[in-house]
Amino acid sequence: MKCFTGLVGAFTPEEVIFMLYMADRTRLREKGYDTLRSKRYYMENMEMGSRIFDKCVEKTTRMGLLERVPVSGMYDYLWHMDSYNRLVGILAELGNPFSTRAFCHRMFDVEKRTVASVSDEEVSQWKERHR
């Protein structure tokens, strides 16, 4: 799984780890692996506590990147690669780490938007104003 370096400037280290881990789980699922695991399993593999894990789940779900599906008393976490690839494209377009951090904070923390709701025009306008 490749890491897009723009994620590092735009999100917290825990959020980046969470995103990369979930994207990798999706890759494994697509290859036919059973990826249903307990919350404890995920937390141990990402070396994060319950509170941080839950915050990452909440934020990425709100962003339209993650879907929690109840299965056998656990949750299966489905990562939406189309939305993730769109996010990577937005970050690549913005380029500047300071600009990407401010943009992501505004769009996803303050306005609580989904990745899919962010238009190319908004990205271009932000880039123009925050050179």
Regions found by a protein language model. Give the residues of each.
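Winged helix-turn-helix DNA-binding recognition segment
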Residues: R25-R86
